[in-house]
């Protein structure tokens, strides 16, 4: 039995092979928005293909239970297809659904919730349509980008899907506008002072990631330089130039991470400027947000989410609420005024410190 026969035997007789071309129709989506086509009984996952579209697909990987394909030519388009706003959408692994109309995105997300409840929770529950933003651009209040080098210059961007190759960019259409200005300027300064990116293969260089947190309502920003070494070239100069250019910067932090894996943040932080946190507001409360503390990524939509949760919960003054995975206490403090007691549970120590401070600063003692 040759290798091809062995492969077909273990795949239940499937004759599909790598580099084969097939004509197929998309029938569904994966949980992360890849199109699913069926060929000889095997599901094939294809990026940038929508339900009911027909196209020519090249098979690029064949496994026992599924295959992966690349869309070569679209022969029949979906009426829900739209032009992606970002010119790097097809290369970058950051976004999955920019080619799908807002209505179809809403349907996709609603169905994903429905399917998850059915398959994992075994709940036969009717799911209301997801509540969508009017304008889903430039909204994210946190971004972390890897730093690399190309043609002798530093680059920042996002990884291609399933790879360690950086798609260099200066503007991301879902990150806040300040981050789109701050990251390229920081990269320019790091190159000016002679810093080099960390190389995962040789373990040379220093700069791993640049991270920004932004307070949507306060216009406060945190900049974090994640480094392989404790040293950082011309720290004082970097801080001086950054604060001069961006008065919104409330704190600048160096995070030391000597690990060789994919964990982004290290354990040790050095505050180069400011108090080590920023503040933002949510539903009438002010919150302290530290580097490792979780805060909802979409500050406008989270208000809609929390208000809807409060409405559905039908809380009573005698209720006792447990806020599991409470983070910095945003849900806890939003609910506290409606109930007798709220308990927040969280594994990240820095987040609990922020939560206690947030309860105190907002006068919440229950």
List each model region and its residues:
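Rossmann-like S-adenosyl-L-methionine
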Residues: 3-9, 15-23, 31, 230-366
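Terminal RNA-binding accessory module
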Residues: 12-88
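Short, acidic/hydrophobic/Gly-rich beta-strand patch recurrent on exposed beta strands
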Residues: 35-40, 157-160, 224-226, 355
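Short, conserved phosphate/pyrophosphate- and ester-handling motifs at nucleotide-, phospho-/glycolipid
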Residues: 52, 175, 298
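Hydrophobic beta-strand signal
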Residues: 56-58, 144, 322
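Extended interfacial segments that mediate partner engagement and assembly in macromolecular machines
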Residues: 72-84, 90-197, 217, 232
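Short edge beta-strands and adjacent turn/loop segments
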Residues: 203-217
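Short, aliphatic-rich beta-strand segments
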Residues: 212, 218-228, 286-290
């Amino acid at each position: 039995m040759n290798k091809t026969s062995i492969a077909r035997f273990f795949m239940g007789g499937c004759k599909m092979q790598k580099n084969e071309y097939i004509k197929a129709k998309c029938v569904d989506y994966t949980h992360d928005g890849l199109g699913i086509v069926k060929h000889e009984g095997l599901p094939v996952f294809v990026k940038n293909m929508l339900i009911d579209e027909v196209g020519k697909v090249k098979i690029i990987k064949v496994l026992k239970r599924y295959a992966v394909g690349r869309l070569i030519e679209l022969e029949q388009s979906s009426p829900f297809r739209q032009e992606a706003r970002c010119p790097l959408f097809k290369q970058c692994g950051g976004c999955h659904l920019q080619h799908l109309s807002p209505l179809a995105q809403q349907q996709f997300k609603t169905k994903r919730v429905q399917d998850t409840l059915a398959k994992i929770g075994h709940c036969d529950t009717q799911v209301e349509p997801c509540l969508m933003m009017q304008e889903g651009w430039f909204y994210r209040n946190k971004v972390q980008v890897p730093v690399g080098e190309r043609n002798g210059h530093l680059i920042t961007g996002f990884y291609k899907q399933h790879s360690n190759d950086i798609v260099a960019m200066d503007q991301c259409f879902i990150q806040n506008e300040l981050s789109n200005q701050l990251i390229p300027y920081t990269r320019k300064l790091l190159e000016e002072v002679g810093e080099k990116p960390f190389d995962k293969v040789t373990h040379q260089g220093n700069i791993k990631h640049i991270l920004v947190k932004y307070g949507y309502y306060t216009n406060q920003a945190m900049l974090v330089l994640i480094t392989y070494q404790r040293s950082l070239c011309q720290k004082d100069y970097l801080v001086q130039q950054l604060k001069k250019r961006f008065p919104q910067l409330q704190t600048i932090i160096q995070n030391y991470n000597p690990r060789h894996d994919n964990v982004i943040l290290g354990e040790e932080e050095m505050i180069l400027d400011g108090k080590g946190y920023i503040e933002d507001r949510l539903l009438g409360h002010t919150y302290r947000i530290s580097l490792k503390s979780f805060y909802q990524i979409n500050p406008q939509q989270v208000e809609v989410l929390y208000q809807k949760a409060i409405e559905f919960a039908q809380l009573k003054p005698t209720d006792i609420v447990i806020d599991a995975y409470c983070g910095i206490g945003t849900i806890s403090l939003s609910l506290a005024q409606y109930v007798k007691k709220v308990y927040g549970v969280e594994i990240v120590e820095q987040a609990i410190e922020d939560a206690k401070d947030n309860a105190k600063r907002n006068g919440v003692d229950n």
